[in-house]
Amino acid sequence: MSITFEVTGYCPCTKCCGKSDGITASGTKAKANHTIAAPKTYAFGTKIQLEGYGTFVVEDRGGAIKGNRIDRFFDTHQEALNWGRKKINGKVV
């Protein structure tokens, strides 16, 4: 089943996370092109394939992450800003 996600970006800086250690809510070290923050409706470890971008793993949460909104992790703040906000079709795999 295809889901349209609203995907924003974040990084390990204090502006994005309030801390800068890069440790996710699940206790893992966040990795670019791997980690996403998703609502609690998606258990930690859930894999979500984003059309055209690959498969990511739910390892984090976020205060504004609700419904079909997810946050893709980037190594730098500039990369997260450059990503912006995108609507992307995806599915749980």
Identify the residue ranges that each predicted region occupies:
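Solvent-exposed, well-ordered loop and adjacent helix/strand elements within mature globular domains
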Residues: 1-93
